[in-house]
Amino acid sequence: MAEIIFIRISKKKLKKRKEPADYEGRTYTDYLEYKIQNPNIPTTEMDTVYNYQSGPYIQTFIFENTSFMIGILHENKTADSMSESLNRFQDKLSDKEYKSLFSLLLTDRGTEFAKPQQFEINMNTGEIRSKIFYCDPQQSSQKPHVENNHNFIREILPNGQDWNHLTQEKINLMFSHINSTPRESLGDKTPYEIFTFIYGKNLATKLNIQKIEKDEVCTTPRLLK
């Protein structure tokens, strides 16, 4: 006679997984709700680009409605290093300028951005300076502008290339050329033209971005040779 085996099936409902504490109130759904309530606060998408896990790393920022992108070179891919960029921007920009660009940040859940308080609060002064939200896991399409603009970086700094020759001055030069490239999405104007129309040339200069004449723009590896 065959042995009968009884399997007890639990009817206990599975609990919905809670968001990690650092992301509570900062999810992409929270971001969409925040944008509905604050439609006049522009979003700045933030990301990191690198070729090797050992670095170096380029922290990128792109400003809503402009396609204007800047980058900060880092040796370390940590929240301490990445949030320090905001400290430097605060030191360099006026309060009005900082708030116009960095009040609202949208990024992914990389470990280098995983300490939201360090981005939202100036740890030196205790001042609340920004609001940060995070895309859902593995959903880079939720910050499409910064992701798409990285294609320009890859034209100049191809995958697999050693980046140890990079300096912040070279990064600034690269983004000056990228921002001086006309875009169909901008009515064939350049990100530099749109950004300076909205914010002024002085602010672009403070961000170390210069206008490059269209016939002098180079978006190939030759630029940084």
Regions found by a protein language model. Give the residues of each.
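Secondary-structure boundary/capping micro-motif
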Residues: 1-148, 154-162, 167, 173-177, ...
